[in-house]
């Protein structure tokens, strides 16, 4: 793994190229339906990403939407107050990929072949 990638991901704790580690992660995800990788990013990367977000928040795209928690149309088979039909409002602000600086730790992570290969192995995507 490149030194730059090692500045973003805790590669000693998470050896993404190791097939045993990948298999363990896939098994954990399959069993628990979730995979938690505590301290996956270095504190330096987290601080950098947070600062970039703050510096670039003026570039964010903001959206608000009404929907149920399942993100599906209402279902007449359930009462109006059932979670399937209860409407919530969500709002979000997203900084789009083209607004992320080229030198960003986030871009390093997203564009790293070793990270994509790890995700494909764990998610069983070819």
Give the role of each language-model region:
Residues 1-81:
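N-terminal auxiliary "cap/dimerization" subdomain that precedes the catalytic jelly-roll/cupin core
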Residues 41, 48-58, 74-126:
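Signature of the catalytic double-stranded beta-helix
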């Amino acid at each position: 793994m490149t030194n730059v990638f090692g500045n973003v991901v805790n590669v000693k704790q998470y050896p993404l190229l190791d097939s045993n580690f990948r298999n363990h992660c896939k098994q954990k995800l399959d069993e628990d339906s979730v995979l938690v990788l505590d301290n996956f990013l270095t504190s330096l990367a987290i601080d950098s990403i947070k600062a970039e977000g703050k510096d670039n928040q003026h570039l964010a795209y903001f959206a608000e939407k009404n929907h149920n928690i399942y993100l599906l149309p209402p279902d007449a088979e359930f009462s109006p107050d059932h979670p399937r039909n209860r409407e919530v409002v969500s709002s979000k602000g997203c900084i789009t990929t083209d607004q992320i600086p080229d030198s960003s730790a986030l871009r390093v992570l997203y564009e790293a072949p070793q990270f994509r290969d790890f995700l494909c192995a764990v998610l069983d995507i070819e």
